[in-house]
C-alpha cells in the first residue's frame, strides 16, 4: 500500500504570481487546482500585504514589484507597488503584464460573496487603465464565459476604492465582460493586468476584501470525518517496485528523462521534462488497453513529489482510443480527457482525477451536506475534452507541460485507482431513519422507537388546556399590571414615555414575541421519486438515485402514514425540479398522537397553541396556518402575497425575483386579488388579529455599492416608456424638474439627444454623477411610496381597524429612500434581521428620523448538535448557546425605543434532507422533526417572556 506523504492543503497566505506565463505554464496561464472536491477555502484566503512570507512568493516578469509603506497604503502598514511594462502595438497579443492571486492549493468558494474590493492608487501624473479578472477552473484554461473581466480607470495621483461585482456582466454594467458561466464555488485565480498597446503604468494595490452577496442563502460546508493514513487503493497500476512494469512508453514520450530509483519506501520514477520541447511528456501505455470498468466509481491517482522550487503546472491527459499520431482518433479533445494541477514547491502527496467527472455532478438537494471522509489529497482539475471516458478501454495516459520556460523535475511514486473521494456517494446511503433523523450520530432525545413518541403524545394530551397566561397578562397577552391606555377593541400603536409600543384591544401595553411558520407546508422533503401521472401516482420511477438512497424507510402507498406524501410541481433549487415529497414531521405526529393525519393534526393544533401560551409568547408569527387564527388564546398576524400580471422591475440583482411595478394600473387589481384571498382567511372584526404583513423581503436593493443602491432606477430608465409604467412615471418626474433635455444633460453630465430618445431608453450603467444619485434617490422614494400607499389603500378598505405591518425588509434589501417612502403608509415598519443582536448588523441611524414603531419579522440561531447539518443563517455552538443567543437578541430589541417586538423563524426544524422548495436543512426550530421541544431554547424564551414588560418599561 502506498503511503500518503506530507501535502499541505490550506496554507495561510495566497500564492501571488507575477509571471506572464506560469514558470511551467502555458499561454492561457492556467493556475492551481480547483475541481469541486478539492481543498475548499470558503472564506477566501486573500493577499496579506502585512506578511513577509507572502511577498517572498512574488515573481517578476514584464513588470517590477516591491513592498512599499510610504505611499498607497490604505490598510495596515504595507502595500504592493507594481510597475507594468509598456506593451507595443507589435506585442499586444504576445504578452499581458499582470499580477495574479491563486489559492495556495485547492479553490476558493465565493458563492456567498457578491464582490471583491480593493484600493488602487495611481502615484503617477498619467491615468492608469487596468483590468481585473476573476476565473474559475474552466476560465483559466481560456473559456471567456468563465472569466469575469472589469476595466478600471484610475485618475492620475488618486486612490480609488474599486469593487468588482461578480454579477457585473449579468447586470450589463459598463466595463464588464465575460464570466456568464463563472462558477463562484470554484474560483482559482484573480488577476490585475494591462492590455496593450499601452505605455508603462504604475499602480499600488492594497486592502483586499470580500463583500457578502445579497440574499439569505448561506451554504454550509459538509462536515468532514478526518481520515489519517493512506487513501485506500482500489487497484494498483504500478508502484515501480522491483519486478513491476513501469508502462512507460518511451517511444511516445517527448523530452523526458526517466530514472528508476529504489528507496526505503519502495520504487519510484524520477522524471525530468525539458523545456526544449513545447509539450514535453511522459506517456504510460500497456501492451493491451486497461479495462477498469469493473471498479465502478473511481479516480485515477498519481502519488507525486515536486522537486521544483517554484510552482509546477502539470497537465494530465487520458485517452480511451489510440492517439491520432499513431493512426487513432484521440487528440487531446476527442476521445481524451485533459486536466491539470499545480504542485506547490515541495508538494508530496496524492493527486487524483475522476475519469467520469461524477463527483462534481452530484446534487443532493441539501444546503448543507452530511459528513464525508476527508483525505490528504488534491484533485486534478478537469480542463477540456471528454467529460467521461470508456473505462473499459484506457489506451494511454500522460503527464506533460505546455510551453515551459524551464525544465521541470518530479517523482512519480505510484499510479493507482482509488475510490472517488470527491463524490463519496456512500455518505448519502441510509442517511435518514424512519423518523426523519440522521442515522450517523446520537443526541439527547433522539427517537429510537414508536413507543417513545406514543408516550410523549399521551403526556402532551394529558396537559391539554391546563395552561394559562403568565401572571400579570391581559387575555391578549398585554401588560395587565401596566398603565391603562385607550382600548379600541383592536391592536394599535402609541408612543409612551418616549418608547413606541403596541397597545392591545383592552388598552394594555403589548410587546410582540412569537414564532413564525407554524404550519405543515415546509416540512416536506424530496424523496427522489417522480410519476408519469402524478395525480394517479402511476408510472412511479426513481428520478434521483442520490435522493432515494437517503431514506432507510418510506411508507408503502397502503400504509396509513402514506397520507404524508404530496407532490411538488416546481422546486426553486435542488436535485429535481419537481417530484414526490414526504413529511416525516407529519408521520411523527400520527405516531405521536394516533389516528389519521387529520385526527393527529387536530391534536397537534391544540397542543401547539398550549405550548405558545405556556412558553409566554404573545403572538403567532408570520405564516401561521390560518387554522390557528381562531384559537382565542394567542394573538396572531395574517399575511398576504401579491401576484398577478402587472409589470415588474428588475434591480439586476433580484434574490427572490423582480419587484412589482406599482405604477402599472394593473397592480391595483393584483393587490385587490390579494385582499380578496386574505378575507377568506380572516374576520375583519377579529380583535385577536394584530395586523397583516404583505409580501416579504422584496429586492429593493442595498447600499453596499451604487449598482445595488440605484439598480432599480438604472434598470427602469433603460426600459421603453411605452412598455414600463415606472419608466413613464420617472420620465414625467424628470420632465417636471428639468423641462429641457439640455438641463438634464448639464445636471447629470450625460449626452441625450432628446426626451424622445430618453423615453425609448436611457441605458446608463457606468459611474453615476452626484446629481444623478440625488435624482435616482428621489425616484426610489417615489417607487416605494407608490407601492406602500397602494397596498395600504386596498388593505384598509377591507381591514380598516387592523395594523398594516409592511413588507419586511431584509438587511440586504432596503435603502434609506425605500424605508423613507414606506414610513408614511405602514403602521409598523418591519425588518428581517439575522444577526447576533440588533446592534451588531444593519444601519439603524434613520430610526429616529422615521420615528415609526418597528418589528423584527425573522431571526434565528441554529446548531449542528442535534442531527442536522446546518446551523442556519446565524449559527450557535450548541443548544445551550442557541438559548443564550436568543436571550441576548431579544434583550437588544426590548432595549430599543422604536422596536415593539420580534418573531423567531421558525417553529419546526427544517427536514434533515432539506425542505423541498430549496434544500434548506437548518436546526432553527423550537421543536425537532419528531415534534420534540428544544428545552434550553424553550426555557430561555419563557424567562424572557416572563420579564419582557419589566425589561421594556421599568428600566
Swiss-Prot record:
GO terms assigned for molecular function: beta-agarase activity; beta-galactosidase activity
Enzyme class: hydrolase
Signal peptide annotation: none
Gene3D superfamilies in the record: Galactose-binding lectin, Glycosidases
GO biological process, one term: carbohydrate metabolic process
Catalytic activity annotation: Hydrolysis of (1->4)-beta-D-galactosidic linkages in agarose, giving the tetramer as the predominant product
One GO cellular component term: beta-galactosidase complex
EC number(s) on file: 3.2.1.81
Disulfide bonds: none
UniProt KW keywords: Glycosidase, Hydrolase
UniProt-listed InterPro entries: Agarase_CBM (IPR040669), Glyco_hydro_42_N (IPR013529), Glycoside_hydrolase_SF (IPR017853)
Family the UniProt entry places it in: Belongs to the glycosyl hydrolase 50 family.
Role summary: Hydrolyzes agarose to yield predominantly neoagarotetraose and neoagarohexaose.
Protein name: Beta-agarase B
Gene name for this UniProt entry: agaB
Amino acid at each position: 500500500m502506498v503511503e500518503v506523504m506530507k501535502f499541505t492543503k490550506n496554507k495561510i497566505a495566497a500564492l501571488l504570481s507575477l509571471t506572464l506565463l506560469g514558470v511551467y505554464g502555458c499561454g492561457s496561464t492556467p493556475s492551481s487546482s480547483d475541481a469541486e472536491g478539492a481543498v475548499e477555502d470558503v472564506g477566501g484566503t486573500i493577499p496579506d500585504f502585512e506578511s513577509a512570507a507572502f511577498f517572498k512568493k512574488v515573481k517578476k516578469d514584464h513588470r517590477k514589484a516591491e513592498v512599499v509603506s510610504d505611499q498607497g497604503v490604505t490598510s495596515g502598514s504595507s502595500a504592493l507597488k507594481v510597475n507594468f511594462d509598456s506593451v507595443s502595438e507589435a506585442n499586444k497579443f504576445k504578452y499581458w503584464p499582470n499580477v495574479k492571486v491563486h489559492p495556495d492549493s485547492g479553490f476558493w468558494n465565493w458563492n456567498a460573496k457578491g464582490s471583491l474590493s480593493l484600493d488602487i492608487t495611481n502615484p503617477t501624473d498619467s491615468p492608469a487603465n487596468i483590468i481585473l479578472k476573476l476565473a474559475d477552473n474552466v476560465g483559466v484554461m481560456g473559456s471567456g464565459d468563465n472569466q469575469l473581466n472589469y476595466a478600471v480607470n484610475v485618475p492620475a495621483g488618486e486612490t480609488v476604492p474599486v469593487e468588482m461585482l461578480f454579477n457585473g456582466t449579468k447586470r450589463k454594467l459598463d466595463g464588464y465582460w465575460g464570466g456568464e458561466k463563472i462558477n463562484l464555488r470554484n474560483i482559482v485565480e484573480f488577476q490585475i493586468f494591462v492590455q496593450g498597446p499601452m505605455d508603462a503604468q504604475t499602480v499600488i494595490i492594497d486592502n483586499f476584501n470580500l463583500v457578502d452577496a445579497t440574499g439569505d442563502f448561506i451554504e454550509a460546508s459538509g462536515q468532514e470525518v478526518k481520515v489519517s493514513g493512506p487513501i485506500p487503493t482500489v487497484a494498483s497500476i504500478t508502484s515501480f517496485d522491483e519486478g513491476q512494469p513501469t508502462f512507460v512508453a518511451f517511444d511516445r514520450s517527448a523530452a523526458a528523462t526517466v530514472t528508476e530509483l529504489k528507496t526505503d519506501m519502495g520504487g519510484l520514477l524520477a522524471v525530468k521534462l525539458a523545456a526544449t520541447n513545447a509539450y514535453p511528456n511522459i506517456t504510460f501505455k500497456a501492451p493491451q488497453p486497461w479495462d477498469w470498468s469493473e471498479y465502478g466509481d473511481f479516480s485515477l491517482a498519481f502519488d507525486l513529489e515536486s522537486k521544483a522550487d517554484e510552482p509546477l503546472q502539470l497537465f494530465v491527459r487520458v485517452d480511451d482510443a489510440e492517439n491520432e499520431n499513431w493512426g487513432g482518433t484521440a487528440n487531446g479533445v476527442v476521445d481524451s480527457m485533459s486536466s491539470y494541477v499545480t504542485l506547490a514547491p515541495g508538494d508530496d502527496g496524492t493527486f487524483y482525477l475522476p475519469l467520469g467527472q461524477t463527483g462534481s455532478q452530484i446534487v443532493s438537494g441539501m444546503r448543507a451536506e452530511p459528513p464525508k471522509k476527508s483525505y490528504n489529497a488534491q484533485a486534478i482539475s478537469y480542463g477540456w475534452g471528454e467529460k467521461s471516458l470508456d473505462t473499459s478501454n484506457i489506451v494511454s495516459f500522460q503527464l506533460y507541460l505546455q510551453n515551459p520556460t524551464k525544465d521541470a523535475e518530479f517523482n512519480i511514486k505510484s499510479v493507482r485507482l482509488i475510490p472517488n473521494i470527491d463524490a463519496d456517494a456512500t455518505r448519502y446511503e441510509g442517511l435518514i431513519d424512519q423518523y426523519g433523523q440522521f442515522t450517523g450520530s446520537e443526541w439527547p432525545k433522539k427517537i429510537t422507537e414508536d413507543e417513545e413518541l406514543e408516550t410523549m403524545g399521551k403526556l402532551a394530551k394529558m396537559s391539554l388546556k391546563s395552561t394559562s397566561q403568565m401572571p400579570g397578562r391581559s387575555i391578549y397577552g398585554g401588560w395587565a399590571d401596566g398603565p391603562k391606555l385607550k382600548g379600541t377593541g383592536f391592536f394599535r400603536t402609541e408612543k409612551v414615555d418616549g418608547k413606541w409600543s403596541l397597545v392591545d384591544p383592552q388598552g394594555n401595553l403589548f410587546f410582540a414575541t412569537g414564532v413564525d411558520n407554524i404550519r405543515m407546508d415546509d416540512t416536506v422533503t424530496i424523496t427522489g421519486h417522480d410519476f408519469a401521472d402524478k395525480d394517479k401516482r402511476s408510472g412511479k420511477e426513481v428520478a434521483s438515485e442520490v435522493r432515494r438512497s437517503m431514506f432507510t424507510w418510506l411508507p408503502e402507498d397502503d400504509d396509513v402514514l402514506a397520507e404524508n406524501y404530496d407532490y411538488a410541481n416546481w422546486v426553486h433549487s435542488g436535485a429535481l425540479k419537481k417530484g414526490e415529497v414526504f413529511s416525516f414531521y407529519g408521520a411523527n405526529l400520527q405516531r405521536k398522537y394516533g389516528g389519521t393525519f387529520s385526527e393527529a393534526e387536530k391534536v397537534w393544533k391544540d397542543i401547539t397553541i398550549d405550548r405558545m401560551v405556556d412558553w409566554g409568547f404573545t403572538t403567532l408569527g408570520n405564516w401561521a396556518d390560518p387554522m390557528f387564527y381562531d384559537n382565542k388564546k394567542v394573538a396572531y398576524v395574517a399575511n398576504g402575497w401579491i401576484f398577478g400580471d402587472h409589470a415588474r422591475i428588475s434591480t439586476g440583482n433580484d434574490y427572490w425575483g423582480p419587484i412589482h411595478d406599482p405604477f402599472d394600473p394593473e397592480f391595483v387589481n393584483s393587490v385587490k386579488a390579494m385582499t380578496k384571498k386574505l378575507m377568506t382567511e380572516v374576520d375583519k372584526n377579529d380583535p385577536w388579529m394584530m395586523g397583516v404583513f404583505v409580501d416579504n423581503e422584496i429586492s429593493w436593493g442595498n447600499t453596499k455599492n451604487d449598482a445595488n443602491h440605484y439598480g432599480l432606477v438604472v434598470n427602469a430608465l433603460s426600459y421603453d416608456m411605452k412598455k414600463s409604467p415606472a419608466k413613464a412615471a420617472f420620465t414625467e418626474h424628470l420632465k417636471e424638474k428639468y423641462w429641457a433635455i439640455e438641463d438634464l444633460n448639464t445636471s447629470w453630465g450625460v449626452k441625450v439627444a432628446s426626451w424622445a430618445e430618453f423615453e425609448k431608453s436611457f441605458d446608463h450603467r457606468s459611474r453615476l454623477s452626484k446629481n444623478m444619485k440625488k435624482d435616482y434617490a428621489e425616484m426610489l422614494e417615489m417607487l416605494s411610496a407608490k407601492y406602500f400607499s397602494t397596498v395600504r389603500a386596498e388593505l384598509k378598505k377591507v381591514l380598516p381597524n387592523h395594523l398594516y405591518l409592511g413588507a419586511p425588509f431584509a438587511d440586504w434589501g432596503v435603502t434609506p429612500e425605500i424605508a423613507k417612502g414606506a414610513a408614511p403608509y405602514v403602521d409598523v415598519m418591519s425588518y428581517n434581521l439575522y444577526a447576533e443582536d440588533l446592534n451588531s448588523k444593519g444601519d439603524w441611524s434613520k430610526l429616529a428620523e422615521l420615528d415609526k414603531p418597528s418589528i423584527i419579522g425573522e431571526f434565528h440561531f441554529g446548531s449542528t448538535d442535534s442531527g442536522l447539518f446546518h446551523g442556519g443563517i446565524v449559527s450557535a455552538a450548541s443548544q445551550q448557546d442557541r438559548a443564550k443567543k436568543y436571550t441576548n437578541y431579544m434583550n437588544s430589541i426590548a432595549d430599543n425605543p422604536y422596536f415593539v417586538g420580534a418573531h423567531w423563524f421558525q417553529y419546526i426544524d427544517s427536514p434533515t434532507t432539506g425542505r423541498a422548495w430549496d434544500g434548506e436543512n437548518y436546526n432553527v426550530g423550537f421543536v425537532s422533526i419528531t415534534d420534540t421541544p428544544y428545552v434550553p431554547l424553550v426555557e430561555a424564551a419563557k424567562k424572557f417572556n416572563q420579564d419582557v414588560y419589566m425589561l421594556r418599561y421599568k428600566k
